[in-house]
């Protein structure tokens, strides 16, 4: 067969002719797929166009197109019927049984059942599926339309129940194909970014919730301000603690805490309870943060808490500490005062320094006697006596403490005018111990040597109380013997003390004679003086001086011509009724009378 040379030359450039029937069929399938892609894009604009699905049949023979042979530089879209394998090793496989063959993909974990897979071939007008670009017409015509409709209905219901499964499988199956790689990867990244943002937002919400909880815990912890517990010594804690008693049984520690908050910040408040029953014993201890709050807490004593007045006082440990401090201060004060100095109080106001010296000089040599006086040079009733020898001071203290002088019981103590609760006997015992210690330290003084006794040991002695029950007042006989400087001191044991004779005085005191509130006359004082003077002159004896003191006691002072008249007046007026009142009459020493009325001495 001879070929024309011109035909042979044009053969390589001539496009291969396709039969008319096959060409029409390909055009119809291509146009139908384009219309299906357009409708799918409008119905789901957010999803990428689905790739075509091959309907597998035993008679199907895969056909692959080569877009490079058609003169294309880039791959055409999937909608034109092209399909690209993921790798050179992947190929289409057919199953031996079943209506459709599954396509083997790398994402095997997302394999879906056969009845959930979507067929991308659109329906035809006659109820059958249109042939895909890779399938034959005969294979589609042999399938039942009813079975196709059932499969499509099941696929639509599955997509409605699982809206995300379609896109997920689509991305997994076709994300690596050339036409979908870039677009689907960007969609996947956007999806992952949204997921990460939502997870971070959830984490942020959780962190905010935890921060809110922490802030709430901090606020709740700040609702009861407390100091951070520091290591305090027991002495410091005792100084900050008060003892509270007379508390109600139903009182709680919180109520006690709030009550003492008005005195200052409270560190701790503990109610003492029974170990077995747990009931309150009515007492508590409250510890403050600062020592200044203790005095403010003591000021709350007497205020009512749950209807009961509370009693606030220092703890026993604090009381003992204050007692020790007071004793140390007393010893420091006594260290500055010689031990051979005495303090004498409750002395009659008319006695002078010479009178007191004459009374205390029989016990030993006196260096000085000094009575305290006011601005008008009147005695204040107390003073100091200093002996040369502490032994003399000891004897004077033992004998003269409590001695009755001019109607007054004198009080004698050591060193200064600060009186303690120590008795004279205990002081004398301590005095002897101190003196013995002093004599051991100075043996030369035991041989008759003189001593000034200015040692620090004597200065450390604390003053004694002048009011004590164990002291025995010196009798008048003993005092008179000492005053007379009798040499027969050994005969003191033979003397028999006689009862002290009553004080004879010309002065009398009448009490409860009147009531100033009931007197209405402007000259009632002069009138009362005249009435009492006339009655006493007539019944008891001559009155040389009388004075009415307008006070609540109703006192009238009367001085008679002699002591017998005064005693007679006291006997007759005592317990007598006068103006509806009972009179109280008593002898008044003349010294007291003259101290009160100095002009009565010349009367």
UniProtKB/Swiss-Prot annotation:
GO (cellular component) term, any one: nucleus
GO molecular function ontology, one term from the record: RNA binding
SUPFAM superfamilies in UniProt: RNA-binding domain, RBD
Keyword Phosphoprotein: yes
Polar residues bias: start-end ranges: 18-28, 441-455
Compositionally skewed regions (Basic and acidic residues) per UniProt: 190-204, 224-239
Domain RRM: 240-317, 340-417, 506-590
PROSITE patterns to which the protein is assigned, alphabetical: RRM (PS50102)
Designated name of the protein: RNA-binding protein rsd1
Organism: Schizosaccharomyces pombe (strain 972 / ATCC 24843) (Fission yeast)
């Amino acid at each position: 067969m001879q070929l024309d040379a011109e035909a042979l030359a044009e053969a390589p450039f001539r496009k291969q002719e396709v039969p008319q029937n096959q060409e029409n069929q390909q055009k119809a399938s291509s146009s139908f797929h384009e219309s299906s892609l357009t409708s799918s894009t409008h119905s789901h604009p957010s999803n990428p166009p689905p790739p075509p699905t091959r309907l597998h049949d035993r008679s199907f023979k895969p056909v692959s197109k080569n877009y490079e042979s058609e003169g294309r530089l880039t791959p055409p879209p999937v909608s034109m019927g092209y399909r690209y394998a993921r790798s050179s090793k992947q190929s289409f496989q057919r199953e031996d049984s079943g209506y459709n063959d599954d396509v083997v993909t790398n994402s095997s974990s997302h394999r879906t059942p056969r009845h959930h897979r979507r067929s991308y071939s659109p329906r035809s007008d006659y109820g059958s599926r249109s042939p895909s670009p890779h399938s034959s017409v005969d294979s589609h015509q042999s399938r039942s339309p009813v079975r196709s409709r059932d499969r499509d209905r099941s696929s639509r219901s599955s997509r409605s129940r699982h809206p995300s499964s379609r896109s997920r499988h689509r991305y997994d199956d076709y994300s690596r194909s050339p036409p979908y790689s870039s677009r689907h990867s960007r969609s996947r990244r956007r999806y992952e970014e949204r997921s990460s943002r939502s997870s971070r937002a959830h984490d942020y919400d959780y962190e905010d919730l935890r921060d809110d909880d922490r802030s709430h815990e901090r606020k709740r912890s700040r609702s009861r301000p407390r100091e951070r517990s520091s290591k305090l010594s027991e002495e410091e804690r005792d100084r900050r603690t008060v003892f509270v008693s007379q508390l109600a049984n139903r009182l709680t520690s919180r109520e006690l805490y709030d009550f003492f908050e008005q005195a200052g910040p409270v560190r701790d408040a503990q109610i003492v309870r029974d170990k077995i029953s747990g009931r309150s014993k009515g007492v508590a201890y409250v510890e403050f943060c600062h020592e200044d709050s203790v005095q403010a807490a003591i000021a709350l004593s007497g205020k009512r808490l749950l209807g009961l007045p509370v009693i606030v006082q220092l703890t026993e440990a604090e009381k003992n500490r204050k007692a020790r401090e007071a004793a140390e201060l007393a010893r420091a004060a006594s260290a500055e005062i010689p031990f051979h100095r005495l303090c004498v109080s409750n002395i009659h106001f008319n006695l002078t320094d010479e009178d007191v010296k004459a009374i205390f000089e029989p016990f030993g040599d006196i260096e000085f006697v000094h009575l305290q006086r006011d601005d008008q040079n009147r005695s204040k009733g107390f003073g100091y006596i200093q002996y040369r020898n502490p032994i003399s001071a000891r004897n004077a203290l033992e004998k003269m403490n409590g001695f009755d002088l001019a109607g007054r019981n004198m009080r004698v103590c050591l060193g200064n005018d600060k009186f303690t609760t120590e008795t004279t006997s205990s002081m004398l015992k301590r005095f002897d111990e101190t003196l013995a210690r002093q004599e051991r330290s100075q043996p030369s003084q035991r041989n008759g040597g003189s001593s000034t006794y200015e040692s620090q040991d004597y200065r450390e002695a604390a003053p004694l109380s002048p009011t004590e029950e164990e002291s025995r007042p010196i009798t008048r006989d003993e005092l008179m013997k000492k005053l007379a400087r009798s040499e027969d001191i050994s005969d003191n044991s033979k003397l028999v003390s006689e009862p002290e004779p009553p004080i004879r005085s010309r002065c009398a005191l009448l009490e409860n004679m009147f009531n100033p509130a009931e007197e209405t006359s402007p000259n009632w004082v002069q009138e009362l003086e005249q009435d009492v003077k006339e009655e006493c002159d007539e019944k008891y004896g001559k009155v040389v001086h009388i004075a009415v003191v307008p006070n609540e006691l109703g006192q009238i002072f009367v001085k008679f011509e002699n002591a017998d008249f005064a005693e007679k007046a006291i006997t007759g007026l005592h317990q007598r009724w006068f103006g509806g009142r009972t009179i109280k009459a008593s002898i008044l020493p003349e010294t007291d009378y003259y101290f009160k009325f100095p002009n009565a001495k010349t009367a």
